């Protein structure tokens, strides 16, 4: 009688652990499918600039820059690739600390 009751308890525990593991796996898969995709776009830096290109690249000759050039690094500028100060609003909204890239001639 003692042996069969231990077997019944083991079967119940195995069933409970299997159910819990299955529930956890389904929860994880649901999280990955729905929640992670929603947050992926929020983590993107470039939300609107040349989205049809696989990689956004701008190149300038140093001689063409003049004395100073200020480039956007927050991807929010309406004058991209040049900075228009949009990082100020971006920093206030997100708590970020991004600023422009400033390239200027060395003062002699």
Curated annotation (Swiss-Prot):
**Known catalytic reactions:** L-cysteine + 2-oxoglutarate = 2-oxo-3-sulfanylpropanoate + L-glutamate
Tissue-wise expression: Liver, adipose, skeletal muscle and heart (at protein level). Widely expressed. Expressed at the highest levels in the heart.
Q: What is its EC number?
A: 2.6.1.3
> InterPro entries per the record?
CISD1/2 (IPR045131), FeS-contain_CDGSH-typ (IPR018967), FeS-contain_mitoNEET_N (IPR019610), MitoNEET_CISD (IPR042216)
- Cite the cofactor comment: Binds 1 [2Fe-2S] cluster per subunit. The [2Fe-2S] cluster is redox-active and pH labile and is significantly less stable at pH 4.5 as compared with pH 7.0.
**CC per GO annotation:** mitochondrial outer membrane; mitochondrion
Report residues binding [2Fe-2S] cluster.
72, 74, 83, 87
Q: Which domain of life is it from?
A: Eukaryota
Task: Give the bilayer topology.
Answer: Single-pass type III membrane protein
Per its UniProt record, the required cofactor names are: [2Fe-2S] cluster; pyridoxal 5'-phosphate
What GO terms are given for molecular function?
2 iron, 2 sulfur cluster binding; iron ion binding; L-cysteine transaminase activity; protein homodimerization activity; pyridoxal phosphate binding
User: Where is the protein localized?
Assistant: Mitochondrion outer membrane
Cytoplasmic side of membrane: 32-108
Q: What keywords does the record list, in alphabetical order? A: 2Fe-2S, Acetylation, Iron, Iron-sulfur, Isopeptide bond, Membrane, Metal-binding, Mitochondrion, Mitochondrion outer membrane, Schiff base, Signal-anchor, Transferase, Transmembrane, Transmembrane helix, Ubl conjugation
Q: Which residues form the active site?
A: 55 (schiff-base intermediate with pyridoxal 5'-phosphate)
Query: An example of a Gene Ontology BP annotation on this entry?
Result: regulation of autophagy
What is the recorded post-translational modification? Ubiquitinated by PRKN during mitophagy, leading to its degradation and enhancement of mitophagy. Deubiquitinated by USP30.
Pfam families found in the cross-reference section: MitoNEET_N, zf-CDGSH
Q: Which residues cross the membrane?
A: 14-31
Range of residues in the leader sequence: none
**Annotated crosslink Glycyl lysine isopeptide (Lys-Gly) (interchain with G-Cter in ubiquitin) location:** 42, 55, 68, 78-79, 89, 104-106
Which PANTHER family did the record assign? CDGSH IRON-SULFUR DOMAIN-CONTAINING PROTEIN 1 (PTHR13680:SF5)
Family from the record: Belongs to the CISD protein family.
Annotated function: L-cysteine transaminase that catalyzes the reversible transfer of the amino group from L-cysteine to the alpha-keto acid 2-oxoglutarate to respectively form 2-oxo-3-sulfanylpropanoate and L-glutamate. The catalytic cycle occurs in the presence of pyridoxal 5'-phosphate (PLP) cofactor that facilitates transamination by initially forming an internal aldimine with the epsilon-amino group of active site Lys-55 residue on the enzyme (PLP-enzyme aldimine), subsequently displaced by formation of an external aldimine with the substrate amino group (PLP-L-cysteine aldimine).
What is the protein's quaternary organization? Homodimer.
- Please report the name of this protein according to its UniProt entry: CDGSH iron-sulfur domain-containing protein 1
At the highest ranks, the source species' classification is:
Eukaryota, Metazoa, Chordata, Craniata, Vertebrata
């Amino acid at each position: 009688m003692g042996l069969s009751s231990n077997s019944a308890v083991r079967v119940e525990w195995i069933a409970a652990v299997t159910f819990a593991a299955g529930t956890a796996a389904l929860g994880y898969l649901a999280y990955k499918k729905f929640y992670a995709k929603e947050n992926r776009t929020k983590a993107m830096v470039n939300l609107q600039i040349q989205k049809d290109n696989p990689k956004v690249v701008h190149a300038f000759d140093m001689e063409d820059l003049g004395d100073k050039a200020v480039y956007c690094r927050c991807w929010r500028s309406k004058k991209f690739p040049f900075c228009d100060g949009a990082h100020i609003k971006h920093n206030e909204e997100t708590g970020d600390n991004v600023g422009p890239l400033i390239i200027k001639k060395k003062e002699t």
